Amino acid sequence: MNRKKSREVAMKLLFEISINKNSISDTIEHYKENNEIENLDFEYIERILRGIDENMEYIDSKIEESSKKWKISRISKINITILRMAAYEIFFEKDIPCKVSANEAVELAKSYAEENSFSFVNGVIGNLINSSEEK
């Protein structure tokens, strides 16, 4: 199964959920019905989506602490989606190296976010990693 592609799909679904306010189950089911799903790790995708949903307050507080002077409400929806995924992986998915989460998030930002957002995303994630290591 392709983790990189699964991470990209998870990001797209998380973004869709943030816009449409549909349930995780409905969003995943709709995706499966309308897209090619071969080589996707839906166990990982669902774990990420549910984990972020269940830990949103904690994740957002960590992002806000790490984004120096930026409130969550000021961060674009796509950037906050990418940051939430990276933060979830950093704090809750201990089998995923922090550097992998950081690199994948920066690549997603380069592909989907505003032109120079990847540097903002990279800086926030660096701070998230540092705060996770302080525990």
From Swiss-Prot:
Q: Which Gene3D superfamilies does the record match to this protein?
A: NusB-like
- GO cellular component, as recorded: cytosol
List the InterPro entries hit by this protein, alphabetically.
NusB-like_sf, NusB_fam, NusB_RsmB_TIM44
Q: What domain of life?
A: Bacteria
Which Cys-Cys disulfides exist here?
Answer: none
GO biological process annotation, one example:
DNA-templated transcription termination
User: Which Pfam families does the entry link to?
Assistant: NusB (PF01029)
Q: What terms describe the molecular function in GO for this protein? A: RNA binding
Keywords tagged on the record:
RNA-binding, Transcription, Transcription antitermination, Transcription regulation
Q: Which SUPFAM superfamilies match?
A: NusB-like
What is its biological role? Involved in transcription antitermination. Required for transcription of ribosomal RNA (rRNA) genes. Binds specifically to the boxA antiterminator sequence of the ribosomal RNA (rrn) operons.
Q: Which family does it belong to?
A: Belongs to the NusB family.
Q: What is this protein called?
A: Transcription antitermination protein NusB
Protein's gene:
nusB
